[in-house]
Design a protein with these regions (language model features):
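Short, small-residue-biased leader/transition segments that mark boundaries at the very start
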Residues: 3-8
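Terminal connector regions
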Residues: 52-79, 107, 113-160, 237-276
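Intrinsically disordered, low-complexity Pro/Gly/Ser/Thr-rich segments with frequent PxxP/GP/PP motifs
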Residues: 78-118, 204-239
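Membrane-proximal extracellular "stem/stalk" segments
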Residues: 156-292
Length: 319
């Protein structure tokens, strides 16, 4: 068996004890070739590197895609996609917490049980290890240092490639940290990882052809069977009620997806979002007006030329 080690700062370390069905030789996470109805014990070794006992909380989570287009393995309530049929959280069981004595290590067994029915594509998730907060620190109101690490788990049953596939779901107006935006939820509804994704979105009036707003993002990733909220910024302009159209183009791996969806912004919705939005900074009263600067320069040059001409004329009259 091979071992790979990841250090969570210097408080404790986690090692994945890679089994014989590990795919590849360089991965530091579990990347396993499995089969239907398979049962297997996976081991991780947690080493406490400090002089006091440490309690480590362990969670199993399915992978999800955050709204920045980054794949994460932490716990996120409400982010599990409706298209996810095989969830790592139901396949892999781990103790909720373990306490490691000072300056020692402990092997923690995890129980993996595959469903009887074969699955296609990739099951992706992770193990989250977090130092349990100090109760004294939390009750006193002090900010507790929390050491967190996510160890990836990848499961496949064959080399058959399942291509990713995208579609747009709900489109609506939202507040993005105090800034008005149009949010289009984009879903990857296949059990396939998506990398180097570029998405461009444009907003039009429902029957219009003029682009009102647009946003382009690149180098995004998506977990299998996940979704994320792609936001088109309104440049701090007030949101107007009415019927609009979202058009998007996504590109990855030589494939292209086109999206189109109409949506409504109600009067009250626009009023509420505008009231809560960060107001666009007004132009400064003393901002430079370049036209006035140019005009002033021409006046100065004209004045200099007039004075020079008068001196020249006086000089020649007196000669």
């Amino acid at each position: 068996r091979r071992q790979r080690q990841m250090c969570i700062r210097d408080r404790f370390t986690v090692k994945a004890e890679l089994p014989e069905n590990q795919r590849g030789t360089s991965a530091s996470y579990f990347d396993l070739r499995v089969s239907p109805n398979q049962a297997q014990t996976l081991n991780v070794v947690i080493q406490n590197r400090q002089a006091d006992p440490v309690t480590v909380l362990i969670k199993v989570n399915p992978a999800f895609t955050n709204d920045n287009g980054v794949v994460e393995y932490g716990e996120q309530v409400g982010r599990t996609d409706a298209s996810l049929k095989v969830n790592l959280k139901t396949l892999l069981k781990a103790p909720t917490e373990v306490t490691i004595p000072a300056l020692s290590q402990q092997t923690v067994p995890l129980q993996l049980k595959l469903p009887a029915q074969a699955f296609a594509g990739t099951v992706l998730g992770g193990l989250q290890f977090m130092a349990k907060p100090d109760e004294k620190a939390t009750t006193s109101g002090a900010v507790a240092n929390r050491y967190v690490y996510a160890l990836g788990v990848v499961l496949t049953e064959s080399d058959q490639v399942v291509p990713p596939n995208l579609r747009v779901q709900e489109v609506k107006a939202v507040s993005d940290h105090g800034h008005n935006a149009i949010q289009a939820n984009i879903q990857n509804f296949e059990p396939a990882m998506l990398k180097d994704l570029t998405v461009e979105g444009k907003i039009f009036e429902a029957d219009g052809s003029k682009t009102l707003y647009q946003t382009r993002k690149h180098e995004l990733k998506m977990a299998p069977n996940s979704n994320f909220n792609f936001k088109v910024d309104l440049n701090d302009e007030p949101l107007k009620p009415g019927k609009y159209r979202f058009e998007g183009v996504a590109k990855a791996g030589g494939r292209t997806w086109h999206f189109k969806k109409t949506f409504m912004v109600a009067q009250k919705e626009a009023d509420d979002l505008n009231a809560a939005a960060v107001k666009k900074a007004p132009a400064q009263a003393n901002a430079i007006d370049w036209r006035l600067m140019i005009l002033a320069g021409l006046v100065v040059l004209l004045t200099i030329n007039v004075i020079a001409f008068k001196r020249y004329a006086r000089h020649h009259r007196g000669a």
